[in-house]
Amino acid sequence: LTGRYDAGSVIPATVEAHDEEYGLTNLSFTGGVLRVPRVKALKGASVRVRIRARDVSLALQKPEGISQINILQGKISEIGSPRNEHDGSPPHDIDICVDIGVPLWVRITRWSLDQMELSEGKEVYALIKSTSIDRQSLGQQAQNMEKIG
């Protein structure tokens, strides 16, 4: 987990396949597969995917018929303490770590935490929009990049 406003997770992954029709790349990692916007890297290349905690939603059941294509099952491994706001108002958000094969940090409101009755050990589904993972969120080794031009 990194800084307050940019908190997130870094997931090591491997380029599994490119979907030329839709401009997506499948990245395999210990917990499954992420579909992200096209990565300019060769199949088999190692990449690191940065996912911001604020870009992840949680569900208690596997959702269907939604636009988010990255739906990963996991278990809550840690619930952080609410942070006090600098303006003196009560804290409204909280960071949660979900084990999806690797640690994935999620930032939700305390209201959602209470309404969903979330607790450590509870099974959840993490939802990550593919469009929230941009090229700046992907780090890769130079020798594995495709030649352009």
Where in the sequence are the language-model features?
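Short, conserved beta-turn/loop elements at beta-strand boundaries and strand-helix junctions
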Residues: 17-23, 79-92
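Short coil/loop residues immediately preceding or within conserved phosphate-binding loops
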Residues: 10, 71, 93-95, 103
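Glycine/charge-rich catalytic "coupling/switch" loops of P-loop NTPases
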Residues: 31-84, 107-149
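Short, acidic/hydrophobic/Gly-rich beta-strand patch recurrent on exposed beta strands
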Residues: 25-30, 95-101, 107
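Internal alpha/beta loop-helix hairpins
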Residues: 1-33, 54
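Hydrophobic beta-strand positions in extracellular immunoglobulin-like domains
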Residues: 15, 76-78, 100
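Residue-level preference for beta-strand/loop junctions
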Residues: 7, 43, 68, 90-92, ...
